Amino acid sequence: MSCCKTIKLVKSPVRGDGYIIDDITNKSISFMENSDSPFFTLITYNTPHSPMQVPDSFFENIEVNLQGRYADKENKIKTQAALAMVENIDYNVGKVINSLKKNNKYENTIIIFFSDNGPNGNRWNLEMKERKGSTNEGGVRVPFFIQWPKKIKSGLVVEQITSVMDVFPSLIDLMNFDSKNNFDGISFKKYLSNPTLIDNDRKIFSYWGQRISVRDNNFILDHNDSLYDLKNDLSQTKPVNNKFSSNYLSLKKSKDDWINDVISNYDNSQRRAFTVNYDESTYTHLPARDADFTGDLTRSSIHANDSFIENWTSEEDYIYWNVNSLNSGMNKVSLYYTLPETSSGTQLTLEFMDNKIKKDIMIPHNPTLEGMKEDRIKRIESYTKDFKKITFGDLFFEKGESILKLKTSKLKGKKSIDFWLLVLEKTE
């Protein structure tokens, strides 16, 4: 059954209007208010997270009163900014709910609120062990709220552990959709009517950076195979391997089986190719974030997200992506760049298999970096700048997998472009 509008990938990056969380909220509200049929809206707030930018009206009203177990490592200004971001999220979630109420959609709308991982800094975290990047509770346990005024009783606290993988099958189940698919997750619908029901056989695995933990409803076995009783020791301070040996052996076997079943078939060194010419998509974005490069080229930050590639001083160096063209077809290519005035006339070449196109970059564009003025503390991510878009040309992609290369074929001056993004638009 079809229920929802489909929003396709946009042709080009868009410039937002004000603080990003406010802007995302306003755009989401506009979409929902103008939806006459049932809709699904995924509102992906990117806070609290660095860079620590938040409006003064929220930042100045925050006092940091709670300290976590790693208080000696805490940056109070960063914590203040993070808490201000949470206040801003709360404000914007309120706007969404008020809009649903105003438009008589609230009672029959399922609203889910949750986060992706633990805090990205050392701050109060319910005394749980560690933070984002850890497979202990402090790194992976997050709040989860669900409401459906028309169907779910308010005030329930579900005791059963669940995973983000459970959200999709649960929504399918709640809406009584028929599905013959085998999901990785498990529907939690039954717990919403019986919140004290427990499945003692359910286990959740967390894997990050070669560290693996597994937990059931009462215990966690961490990456060092230390067992903790989470009902009585949420902070994971006292291993209980000997006291609860049967629980230890059960979780250890589950962990070993999972490693053999999943990790043994997982090769982190093999990166999947980026797909082009997919039947259901007109546009493909290939950002610097996902590119590889050679020679003296560098990334603007060790953190790839929203970075750009710079220090292009040699015709021998190039930027590349492993690309799988699912079908043969022509693509219109757009490129986002900056270039100093002294390098005007630099020629770029883009090639895939036996096909290539060239472009002389005649218009210099060399803006300054942005972002530092609004940061509450010095960021670890890349600063950004206003990259210029040009039409590069039309490139034919043969069906198959190969390397897409962006080269400086003629360097004028001492420095080629700083590169941010390629956009491919399927034209046939």
How should each PLM-predicted stretch be described?
Residues 1-39, 45-54, 68, 72-74, ...:
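Formylglycine-dependent
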Residues 35-41, 105-111, 199-201, 216-219:
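Loop/turn elements at helix/coil->beta-strand transitions in domains of secreted/extracellular proteins
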